[in-house]
A protein has these predicted regions:
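Ankyrin-repeat boundary/"N-cap" motif
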Residues: 76-79, 102-140, 162-176, 192-205, ...
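Conserved ankyrin/ankyrin-like repeat signature
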Residues: 88, 145-152, 178-179, 210-214, ...
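Terminal, low-structured helical/coil segments at or just beyond the last alpha-helical repeat
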Residues: 382-407
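Ankyrin repeat domain, specifically the short helix-to-loop turn at the C-terminus of the second helix
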Residues: 93-99, 151-162, 181-189, 213-223, ...
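Intrinsically disordered, low-complexity eukaryotic regions enriched in glycine, serine
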Residues: 1-91, 95-99, 106, 120, ...
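Short, structured interface segments
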Residues: 64-72, 209-223
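Short, hydrophobic/amphipathic alpha-helical patches that form generic packing surfaces
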Residues: 54-65, 116, 231-234, 289-292
Length: 407
C-alpha cells in the first residue's frame, strides 16, 4: 500500500522538489528519510553517496509507482486527460503500457487520480456524443468518423476509467445489449454490482437478443451465472438447454420455483413481485418462461423438442395456477407490441384457446399494484377482465378469438 497520498491534480515539479528534499534529508541522515530509503529502495545505499535518481526512485515507490518514469508518466497522463489532450494521452500510454490498470487491484496510489480523471473524461465524451446525436453503441459504431472517439473511450477504460453506473444500469434496464457490451469494453466493472445481473432478469423490458448479449458479457467478465435450465433459457443458450435435456429427459415437463428463475445468488429480490412478468412464472415450465420473455427461438426449440404446448403451471393450496403458456401472451409488460409471434406459434402448435385457470396477479409500479384474483378464466376471459387494460395485449386476444377462444 502506498505510504504517501497521491494528489488528484499533480504537477511534476511538486515531485521533483520532493525528491530533492528527500535527497537532502537522507544525506543529513534524517530518520524519516532513512526509513523511506530502507522501505522503498531495492538496495542498501550509503546516505552520503545517495544520488537524485535514488531519491526519485524511493519517492516514486512511496507513491505506489514502480519507478520514477512511471510516476512521471502518470502525472503526464492525468494532465493530458484533464485538458482533453487525447493525442498526448495516446503517446504517453503507448510509451508506458504499465499505466493500464489491473481491475482486480484497488484504486490506490497514482491509480486513483488517473482513474478519476479518466472517469470524468469518459462522461464528457459520452455527453458530447449525445449532443452529436449519438445515443447508442450501434449509432456510434455506424459512424466511421467517430472511430477516434471510440478509441479514446477504450483507452480511458484501460487506464482505469469507468462509465457512470446509471448509464450501465440504464442499458441493462432496457436490455440494450450493444450499449452494455460497449460500456463493459470501456471500463464498466461488470462484476462490481450483482444488482445489474438481477436487473437483467427482473426487468420489464423484452428484447431477447439484448438480454442474451448482456448475460454473455457478464459471463465473460466472471459473473457467476448458475448452471441451471432457467439460466440457460435466460441466456438463450440452446446448446446448454440441449445438455440439460440430455441429462434430464423429463426437463421440458418440469416446473420451476421462483428462486430457480430469479436466483438469490445474483441478488434477485426476495419480494417476488419485483420480478416483472405477466402470468405467474413461479411453478411454471420453461415454455411459460420463453413465452413471457418473448424468446421466439427458444420457444420454438422447446416445442420442437417435445414440450407440451398445453402444459400447466402448478396449482397451489388456494387453487391458484394451472395456466398454460398462452396466458403469458395475454397480460404482459409489452402489451403494445406490433406483432404476436408467440401467440401465433402456440396456437399453430395446438394451444387450447379455452384452457381454464385461476390466477392471482398484481403489477409492481403500476397504477394499481395490488394483486387481483381471476377464477376459472380462459385466456380471453382473463385478458378482458384484467384490472389494468394497459397491460393486456389486444393483438393476442384477437388471435385467440380467431381460433375459437371465448370467455
Amino acid at each position: 500500500m502506498p505510504a504517501r497520498q497521491f494528489p488528484f491534480r499533480p504537477h511534476l515539479d511538486q515531485f521533483r522538489n520532493q525528491a530533492k528534499d528527500l535527497l537532502r534529508d537522507v544525506r543529513a541522515e534524517a530518520q524519516s528519510a532513512l526509513d523511506d530509503f530502507r522501505e522503498f529502495h531495492p538496495e542498501r545505499i550509503d546516505p552520503s553517496i545517495a544520488a537524485l535518481a535514488d531519491a526519485q526512485l524511493v519517492l516514486a515507490r512511496s507513491y505506489g509507482a514502480s519507478s520514477w518514469p512511471q510516476l512521471a508518466a502518470a502525472v503526464t497522463a492525468i494532465d493530458a486527460i484533464s485538458h482533453d489532450d487525447f493525442e498526448a494521452l495516446r503517446k504517453v500510454a503507448a510509451a508506458h503500457p504499465d499505466l493500464a490498470r489491473d481491475r482486480d487491484r484497488p484504486r490506490d496510489g497514482w491509480h486513483a487520480p488517473l482513474a478519476s480523471a479518466a472517469d470524468a473524461a469518459i462522461r464528457r465524451l459520452m455527453l458530447q456524443l449525445r449532443e452529436r446525436g449519438v445515443h447508442s453503441a450501434d449509432a456510434l459504431l455506424a459512424r466511421p468518423e467517430l472511430q477516434p472517439v471510440l478509441d479514446t473511450l477504450r483507452l480511458l477504460g484501460r487506464l482505469g476509467g469507468s462509465p457512470a453506473g446509471d448509464w450501465v444500469g440504464g442499458s441493462v434496464e432496457v436490455l440494450r445489449g450493444s450499449d452494455f457490451a460497449l460500456l463493459a469494453e470501456i471500463g464498466a466493472d461488470v462484476r462490481a454490482s450483482l444488482g445489474w445481473a438481477a436487473l437483467v432478469l427482473e426487468t420489464y423490458a423484452r428484447d431477447p437478443a439484448g438480454k442474451h448479449r448482456i448475460l454473455e458479457v457478464m459471463a465473460s467478465h466472471g459473473v457467476p451465472l448458475p448452471d441451471s435450465p432457467p439460466m440457460a433459457l435466460h441466456r438463450g443458450r440452446l446448446d446448454l438447454l440441449e445438455e440439460h435435456l440430455r441429462r434430464d429427459p423429463a426437463l421440458l415437463a418440469r416446473t420451476f420455483a421462483h428462486e430457480d428463475i430469479y436466483p438469490a445468488s445474483l441478488a434477485c429480490h426476495d419480494e417476488h413481485t419485483l420480478a416483472l412478468h405477466g402470468a405467474p412464472l413461479a411453478g411454471a415450465t420453461l415454455l411459460h418462461m420463453a413465452v413471457d420473455y418473448e424468446d421466439l427461438d427458444v420457444a420454438r426449440w422447446l416445442l420442437d423438442h417435445g414440450a407440451d404446448v398445453n402444459a400447466r403451471a402448478e396449482i397451489d393450496a388456494a387453487g391458484l395456477g394451472g395456466h398454460t403458456a398462452l396466458f403469458n401472451c395475454v397480460v404482459t409488460y409489452n402489451a403494445g407490441r406490433k406483432d404476436e409471434p408467440l401467440a401465433r406459434l402456440l396456437l399453430e402448435r395446438g394451444a387450447d384457446p379455452n384452457a381454464r385457470a385461476s390466477i392471482r396477479k398484481g403489477f409492481a409500479f403500476s397504477r394499481d399494484p395490488s394483486p387481483h384474483e381471476y377464477r376459472d378464466v380462459t385466456p380471453l376471459g382473463w385478458g378482458r377482465r384484467f384490472h389494468d387494460q394497459g397491460m393486456v395485449s389486444h393483438g393476442a386476444l384477437r388471435l385467440i378469438a380467431e381460433r375459437g377462444g371465448h370467455e
